[in-house]
Amino acid sequence: MNPFPRAEISSSALQTNLAALRQQAPASRVMAVVKANGYGHGLLNVAHCLVSADGFGLARLDEALELRAGGVTARLLLLEGFFRATDLPLLVGHDIDTVVHHSSQLEMLEQTVLSKPVTVWLKVDSGMHRLGFTPEQFSTVYDRLMACPNVAKPIHLMTHFACADEPDNTYTSVQMAAFNSLTAGLPGFRTLANSAGALYWPQSQGDWIRPGIALYGVSPVTGDCGANHGLVPAMELVSQLIAVRDHKANQPVGYGCFWTAKQDTRLGVVAIGYGDGYPRNAPEGTPVWVNGRRVPIVGRVSMDMLTVDLGQDAQDKVGDSALLWGKALPVEEVAEHIGTIAYELVTKLTPRVAVCLA
């Protein structure tokens, strides 16, 4: 078997996670967020596995066009909207919805001649202060969109939460109240809830939920695990041992002689490194799953390899599988060891890692 790392994607896990989220929000439609190459799981792979989703959320127009070219006919929404007037005919031609969050987008809609109107989701800045129109701007912007012949009616309404992944933080309630007050009585769909909103803030679920990381079996909350919500990891990042070596006490290993063995042991070298997207800053003790147990990384992660301490009496051999994260070793646990979030780990795999449906 090829010793190089691969990300094995489970279609059944993706479908299980979609079903679990529907159960969490039975009155809502699901806008499956597949931006950033399906959170590293493969854009078309994920979309085809989640064909029963009601729509897909994307960050960029090229992602939406790839889905249309791949035969995806569901509703598509550009979560950051469009950036050039020349994008608008593509939205029309490929039946792609757009978020409008900035005055420049509004002006382009007003000034461009289109063959038919575009479906717009007006983004309200309810407190995240990143994208969207402030409550003070909302009424004027809404009226301009209503008057614009290039905008399909009704206009849909959305916001995004800053702290929904902190279940005890009341700021999410503040944002919900601001959004609901501002949009009361207006027609159109409403969408507020990301993964954390769908899982932890049921009152935010609205007409559509927009789950991202949860679809891939990962909890959005630090210290939590997707399995606690009936979610199954969709990615197994696997490689192999390409060397097993006896190692003497007081001998270092790796660049900079960063780690020194306290006793005689056996070391395993795994064929994965920062050239594959595994973080170079993974500290000593970060777990890897080998033959049914966690073994710690020792020494520095290099471009193509990392080293694990298998233990003095280990019987592991060259060619044995090494799981970097997956069902047996949740990516949330690995991320916590490294001091990052699971989102970053799954989306930063490089093209050297083969992504395949398992």
Swiss-Prot record:
Q: Which InterPro entries match?
A: Ala_racemase, Ala_racemase/Decarboxylase_C, Ala_racemase_C, Ala_racemase_N, Ala_racemase_pyridoxalP-BS, PLP-binding_barrel
Q: Which reaction does it catalyse?
A: L-alanine = D-alanine
Q: Which residues carry this modification: N6-(pyridoxal phosphate)lysine?
A: K35
Enzyme kind, highest EC tier: isomerase
Q: Write the signal peptide boundaries.
A: none
Cofactor or coenzyme needed: pyridoxal 5'-phosphate
Respond yes or no to whether keyword Transmembrane helix is given for this record: no
Domain of life assignment: Bacteria
Spell out the Pfam families in the cross-references.
Ala_racemase_C, Ala_racemase_N
Q: Known CDD domains for this protein?
A: PLPDE_III_AR_proteobact
What EC number(s) is this enzyme filed under? 5.1.1.1
Q: One cellular component GO annotation, for this chain's record?
A: cytosol
* Residues of the active site: K35, Y255
Biological processes per GO annotation: D-alanine biosynthetic process
Which keywords does UniProt give here?
Isomerase, Pyridoxal phosphate
Q: Which HAMAP family match?
A: Ala_racemase
Q: What is the protein's known function? A: Catalyzes the interconversion of L-alanine and D-alanine. May also act on other amino acids.
Report the family membership: Belongs to the alanine racemase family.
Q: What is this protein called?
A: Alanine racemase
Q: Which organism is it from?
A: Shewanella baltica (strain OS223)
